Each structure stands twice: as structure tokens, then as C-alpha cells.
């Protein structure tokens, strides 16, 4: 769905583990890394699109994750001119995204990059929370910064809680 301003409706997905790290995935056959994301189909809610994309891109089902929060509004980025397909109608000049922060509830082996048979990614890893802001392609950087800042209040307490639990486990009686 492309709106009247030329922005395609899209969902972005940040999956975190119990340590507050986030899943970072490498685009298939490329050297670029990003969070899972994908378009919202006609008649589909943002949450429905998120669950569909979650399965298509990383093989996770609703029972594998818990929604922690989502962005208050849609965030936009413009595509570089070289990526705009002028011959498509309507012309898409960028994406408007609703972002979701999910916590992985299942074991990591539930992640399957080839679940749909058409992989978007060929590798993934856990990275520190702020790492993606510095590493994503430049035209997505502002949106990533805004999303990570908005979600920090939800995610960073996970890191503190787990760190405290590890310290308690290391104490000798």
C-alpha cells in the first residue's frame, strides 16, 4: 500500500533476548544488515503484517514471541534517488513504518531464516542494543535512532535485570 505522498506502509521488527540484545540480520547475498521488515498488505493491520513478516523472514510464530511495545506513530524514511523505481505506478519514494519490539520467548533454534522458502536473510546474530543505529545503511539511520530511543525505556531494564540476576548467581554464600 502506497499512500498519496508516495510512502509504502511497512512494519519493522526488533526482536530482543533476555539480555536486552537485539537480533541483527544480514540481507540475503549482500553485505548489509538490518532488522526484519516488510510491507503491509491491503486489508491487513500493522500487527497482522508484523506476524506475517516475522514468520516469512525469520520463521517465528506468535507463540515464540511477546509484543513488548510498538511505536506511537508511523516513522518515515525516503529512499535514495537511485533506489526509486520511476516506472512503477504509483511511484514509491520511501517507507512509513510502524515498529514492534518483541521479546523472544522460545529457544533460539526456533529461528529459521528459510521458513518461507524465499529467504530474505542468510545470517543473523545478537548485538548490543545501540549497535544497529551505527551500522544500518545511512538512509535508514534516522528512523533506527528514533525507534531505538523510543524503545530504550522498555528494553534497557531487561539488561539491568539480567545483569543483576547474573551477579546474584555469582555470589558465594
From Swiss-Prot:
Q: Which residues form the signal peptide?
A: none
What does the record give as the function of this protein? Accelerates the degradation of transcripts by removing pyrophosphate from the 5'-end of triphosphorylated RNA, leading to a more labile monophosphorylated state that can stimulate subsequent ribonuclease cleavage.
Question: Which cofactor is essential here?
Answer: a divalent metal cation
From what superkingdom does this record's organism come? Bacteria
> Which InterPro entries does its entry note?
Nudix_hydrolase, NUDIX_hydrolase-like_dom_sf, NUDIX_hydrolase_CS, NUDIX_hydrolase_dom, RppH
What region holds the Nudix hydrolase domain? 6-149
Where on this chain is Nudix box (motif)?
Answer: 38-59
Which species is the source of this protein? Shewanella halifaxensis (strain HAW-EB4)
Q: What class does this enzyme belong to in the EC scheme?
A: hydrolase
Identification of the protein by name: RNA pyrophosphohydrolase
Amino acid at each position: 500500500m502506497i499512500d498519496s505522498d508516495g510512502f509504502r506502509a511497512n512494519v519493522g521488527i526488533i526482536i530482543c533476548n533476555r539480555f536486552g540484545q537485539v537480533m541483527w540480520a544480514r540481507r540475503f547475498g549482500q553485505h548489509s544488515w538490518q532488522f526484519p521488515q516488510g510491507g503491509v498488505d491491503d486489508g491487513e493491520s500493522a500487527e497482522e503484517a508484523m506476524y506475517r513478516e516475522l514468520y516469512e523472514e525469520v520463521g517465528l510464530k506468535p507463540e515464540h514471541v511477546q509484543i513488548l511495545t510498538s511505536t506511537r506513530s508511523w516513522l518515515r524514511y525516503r529512499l535514495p534517488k537511485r533506489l526509486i523505481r520511476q516506472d512503477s505506478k504509483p511511484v514509491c519514494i520511501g517507507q512509513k513504518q510502524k515498529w514492534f519490539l518483541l521479546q523472544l520467548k522460545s529457544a533460539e533454534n526456533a529461528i529459521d531464516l528459510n521458513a518461507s522458502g524465499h529467504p530474505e536473510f542468510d545470517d543473523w546474530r545478537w548485538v548490543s542494543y545501540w549497535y544497529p543505529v551505527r551500522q544500518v545503511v545511512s538512509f535508514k539511520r534516522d528512523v533506527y535512532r528514533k525507534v531505538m530511543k523510543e524503545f530504550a525505556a522498555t528494553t534497557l531494564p531487561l539488561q539491568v535485570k539480567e545483569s543483576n540476576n547474573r551477579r546474584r548467581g555469582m555470589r558465594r554464600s
